[in-house]
């Protein structure tokens, strides 16, 4: 939203890899993770050095106090509202968690992605969302599903929609619209 401030009130934003759609700071769609999974997700990479979880809720990203400066810098690039907490799984933090993202100071595809898939795939959806990022969501949640939800809610067809993508987590989004463009840096 902050990158589109002049036009933001006229736009819908697909957030948290499709688990949340916002318009004018209001939730249009939300598809949260079952709270019973959150603790297991957050602790899935505890044994991996340089990997940090971000618990994503509508409007705020939660990170732990033990985070590195590099991780905090990178998190603030993508999440305008970051709250540093002692325990990501403390009571009261689990409702409406849209996504748990993991930042890897190394290469996410070869380091954390295999570990997360081995521990979590099946009951959860896991996708590579950047060189250093892996996202964990409710099964079947992706940007394409969010786009189809928007289309249904607004009564518009895929042919009337356009999308731009820059990474692998945009594939379903690009397939859900009539006009799609992969960015040059993709």
Regions found by a protein language model. Give the residues of each.
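Short, glycine/polar-rich helix-capping loops at beta-to-alpha or helix-loop-helix junctions
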Residues: 169-170, 183-186
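Glycine-centered loop/turn positions within well-structured domains
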Residues: 19-20, 134, 181
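Catalytic cores of alpha/beta
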Residues: 2-3, 173-175
């Amino acid at each position: 939203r902050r990158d589109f401030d002049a036009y933001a009130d006229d736009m819908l934003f697909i957030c948290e890899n499709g688990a949340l759609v916002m318009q004018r700071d209001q939730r249009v769609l939300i598809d949260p993770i079952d709270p019973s999974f959150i603790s297991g997700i957050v602790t899935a990479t505890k044994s991996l050095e340089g990997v940090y979880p971000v618990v994503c809720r509508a409007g705020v990203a939660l990170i732990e106090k033990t985070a590195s400066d590099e991780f905090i810098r990178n998190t603030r690039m993508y999440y305008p509202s970051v709250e540093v907490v002692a325990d990501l799984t403390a009571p009261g933090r689990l409702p409406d968690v849209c996504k748990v993202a993991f930042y890897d100071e190394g290469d996410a595809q070869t380091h954390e992605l295999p570990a997360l898939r081995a521990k979590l795939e099946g009951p959860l959806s896991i996708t590579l969302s950047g060189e250093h990022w892996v996202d964990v969501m409710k099964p079947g949640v992706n940007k394409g599903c969010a786009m189809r939800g928007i289309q249904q809610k607004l009564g518009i067809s895929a042919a009337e929609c356009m999308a731009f993508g820059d990474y692998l987590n945009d594939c379903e989004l690009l397939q859900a619209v009539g006009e799609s463009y992969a960015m040059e840096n993709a």
